Each structure stands twice: as structure tokens, then as C-alpha cells.
């Protein structure tokens, strides 16, 4: 059974979608998730990333130069890269492992950091 996402996590996921569209992408990847996690204030992930000196401006600038606009998607499930899907699925595991009743932004961040081959980790 899936745990619900917290209100903050829902906002982060929506922000990741918005960031992808703003950058001209038809998909959401780990890179969009890290930008969203570092952009949505008053969340646990935001605090952790800021306390550890993540420079969101540098990440966004790097994304603008490394990502190409477009990409074909055929449906809602295909909207997320395999890496982003794994991160969101693994965030469920992290929440359960930590005995949480819902998936918080900290669980998404934990899952993202463990996805060592993803674009977001390389940008960090």
C-alpha cells in the first residue's frame, strides 16, 4: 500500500513539473526534482540543501546548457524519466523505513541522493 505524499511533497512534485516545462522539456527528471526540492521553501529538504550550501542558481544554469528542449512523451507515466520514477518509488521505501505516515520532502531527497547515477546527483 502506498503512503500518501505530504502537502509539501505534492508541491515539490508540481514544482518539478513546472521547472521542466519552463526549461522546455516534456519530461520530469531527477534534475527537475532537485531544483524543486531546493526551491520550495519551508520544507525539510529545502533546509537540508540550503544548510549544505547547494547553489540552485548554478544548477539551473548548468541545466540550461546541458539539456535539450523537447523529448517525446506518450502518456502520463512516460512523463517521468526512469530515474525520477525510481526516486519517487524509493521515497515510499524511505518513508516506511523511517516509520513515517506520509512521504515527506526529506524522503524524496534521501531517495534522490541514493540514485547515484542520476543527473541531479552529478549536478550537485
What kind of region is each of these model predictions?
Residues 1-124:
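Histone-fold recognition with a strong bias for associated Lys/Arg-rich disordered tails
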